[in-house]
Design a protein with these regions (language model features):
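C-terminal catalytic domains of large/alpha subunits in multi-subunit enzymes
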Residues: 1-41, 45, 87-361
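Generic recognition of short, well-ordered alpha-helical segments
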Residues: 10, 54, 82-83
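Thiamine diphosphate
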Residues: 80-88
Length: 361
């Protein structure tokens, strides 16, 4: 596939400027056995599984002039209900509050492959856009009937259908309200005001991310403290920048947990040793340092409103960026997560150490 939208070069420069890479990259001796170093990583991901993922959306004009939207995607905290409502509202020239979203119900919802593979905004978003465009055209057709003219002569501004050039209108009226159209849709009408659109993409355009991290490493204990993490993401056009930002911040936190803390080991009986949160360590807010997230935009022509995905890419850069920073601080590459203090000390003590198996036997 050819990447039609890529702002990775701008992401690198933006990230380096905000992070002050030139100042933080040199290894600095802080005394007491502690050094500071910086690392960076680049990542790309997909926006769906091309030719596999399917998303659908049903939009219905209610009798009070608002809309109901039914989707098969489940909002698991990613904010897809909000984002898809925003997309429909943009096409229908209304407020997102005018759209009531009904989430996944296998008995009633249109089919969706699922909220996975970073595909909801890209795949179900396109289905939502297409459904909204079709419903908009049907609203114009019903409005044109009430105005006694052809649908090509009217437009819709979200509140009423109006004649673009009112001269010569048969019944003298130049506009009809959305509520009147909703009422007309229930009487002697053959134009549907509930439409379903389904979409699957032949391509999977990649979003991009740059992550830069500054650490302080204690050479006497192997402990790593994160000071700053700067991220710049190209996810196409961010439909909801606030949701995109917190999605990125959360993913960075998860990536830091994977890189430094989280591990699964098995005892001799085959049972997981870390079977509760007392043993399975995840980072808290004080463990992730200062996180700053910015965006560089690109327009993806195959996505709704130019979007690409952001779901999974945000977890990809912390581990390699931290590995780079630890290498800068110690001269040893670590390739198996988590990068625990024990592994870091072993690596500094034995240059030929290759991360021997530390699992419980």
């Amino acid at each position: 596939e050819t990447a039609n939208a890529c702002a990775l070069d701008r992401c690198i420069m933006h990230c380096a400027d905000n992070f002050h890479w030139a100042d933080k990259y040199p290894v600095r001796d802080m005394g007491n056995g502690k050094v500071r170093a910086a690392g960076m990583a680049l990542a790309m991901q997909g926006s769906c599984i091309s030719n596999v993922d399917v998303g659908s959306c049903t939009l219905k004009l209610s009798d009070c002039g608002t809309y109901n939207m039914m989707i098969g995607a489940a909002d698991m905290g990613t904010g897809c209900d909000t984002i898809l409502a925003q997309m429909a509202a943009e096409v229908l020239d209304c407020e997102p509050d005018d759209i009531t979203v009904f989430g996944a119900d296998t008995d009633a919802s249109p089919y969706d492959s699922g909220s996975y593979a970073s595909s909801t905004t890209y795949i179900t978003g396109m289905a939502t856009q297409n459904a909204a465009l079709e419903l908009r055209e049907n609203i114009k057709k019903i409005g044109a009937q009430l105005l006694g003219c052809d649908a090509s002569e009217v437009d819709f501004d979200g509140k009423e259908v109006y004649i673009i050039n009112p001269d010569g209108a048969d019944n003298g009226a130049v506009s009809v309200s959305l509520s009147d159209i909703a009422t007309k849709a229930q009487v002697n009408n053959t134009i549907p005001v509930d439409v379903t659109a389904t979409y699957s993409s032949p391509v999977s355009p990649p979003p991009y991310m740059v992550g830069m991290v500054e650490i302080e490493l204690d050479k006497e204990t192997g402990a790593v403290k994160i000071l700053d993490y700067q991220a710049v993401v190209d996810c196409g056009i961010p439909v909801n920048p606030n949701l995109a930002r917190v999605q990125t911040e959360g993913g960075i936190g998860q990536g830091i947990g994977m890189a430094l803390y989280e591990n699964v080991t098995y005892n001799a009986g085959g049972k997981i040793a870390e079977n509760d949160l007392m043993q399975y360590k995840i980072p808290t807010r004080q463990d992730v340092g200062n996180i700053n997230v910015e965006f560089e935009t690109s327009y993806e022509p195959s996505g709704p409103f130019g979007v690409k995905s952001i779901g999974e890419i945000v977890i990809n850069t912390p581990a390699p960026a931290l590995a780079h920073a630890i290498y800068r601080a110690t001269g040893v590459w670590h390739r198996t997560v988590p990068f625990t203090p024990e592994k870091i000390l072993m690596g500094m003590a034995d240059p030929n150490w290759h991360e021997k198996d530390l699992r419980v036997k």
